[in-house]
């Protein structure tokens, strides 16, 4: 069974390595072109391209597969049996979807039909979902709308950030792809309809939940609004890790880890803090700096405790060290 693998980020690269290690024949990889990354804006290959080169697999890079007639023809000539797509970053046109005789299959990091689109892991955390997962689906022209042949779920822990959850889902995806390939190879000679029937594919209209859209994350999304409630801010910091940021004295500060302050219970003291915030405290205002605990500041409701952060031009550090680097004091306001 000859496979063409489509993917771009580290998440997908781990899937590629797993498939090759399992003994499957990956005859080519399609990925996004090299892009400028890091502080020096050095032109760098995608993690999938790096993995493919390590594995001596031919690589095709394309800005737009829909417009790239040359790559389309090269792929057609490969006569692959299966296309596997994992976080490729482009929508595949029908003429590509129709090429492999055993179909095009996508591993998507959500419990479909929830969070169709480019950033399902980010939005599941930002939205404070308690559960997410992996779906293996047959690809069609719609955005992540195809019938599902495999699904596995995982609990989103309170401590999960984007990196932690992405790594867990990548391992789940690798496992489900291997399970799916074992079944797909048994459908040789069947047309698409018969193949899906043999694989017990489930139409998404018969799955739990309502459709939702996980749009691409923008730079503007990463800016923290301290006027929001504490829980919403925490979930944004976790879901956009390590990119959620604020400003102080026109310098960018990335907030890497924060928690709702542990004294935010139903005690009279806690309620007094909340009540004071309505009258005396401004969202974003620092109300405590402590060497052991860090920086505590107000939100729209309860205070949060910043544990780790990164001032632009500096390395990531604990928030007390950040307060020294930034010359922060009690009553100063972040976001300005």
Swiss-Prot record:
Catalytic reaction equation(s): L-methionyl-tRNA(fMet) + (6R)-10-formyltetrahydrofolate = N-formyl-L-methionyl-tRNA(fMet) + (6S)-5,6,7,8-tetrahydrofolate + H(+)
Keywords for this protein: Protein biosynthesis, Transferase
This protein's GO CC annotations: cytosol
Keyword Acetylation: no
Top-level enzyme category: transferase
GO molecular function per UniProt: methionyl-tRNA formyltransferase activity
UniProt binding sites for (6S)-5,6,7,8-tetrahydrofolate: 110-113
InterPro entries hit by this protein: Fmt, Formyl_trans_C, Formyl_transf_N, Formyl_transf_N_sf, Formyl_transferase-like_C_sf, Met-tRNA-FMT_C, Met-tRNA-FMT_N
Enzyme Commission code: 2.1.2.9
NCBIfam families associated with the record: fmt
Function as written in the Swiss-Prot or TrEMBL entry: Attaches a formyl group to the free amino group of methionyl-tRNA(fMet). The formyl group appears to play a dual role in the initiator identity of N-formylmethionyl-tRNA by promoting its recognition by IF2 and preventing the misappropriation of this tRNA by the elongation apparatus.
UniProt cross-references to PANTHER family, sorted A to Z: METHIONYL-TRNA FORMYLTRANSFERASE, METHIONYL-TRNA FORMYLTRANSFERASE, MITOCHONDRIAL
Annotated HAMAP family: Formyl_trans (MF_00182)
Family named by the database record: Belongs to the Fmt family.
Identification of the protein by name: Methionyl-tRNA formyltransferase
Species for this entry: Prochlorococcus marinus (strain NATL1A)
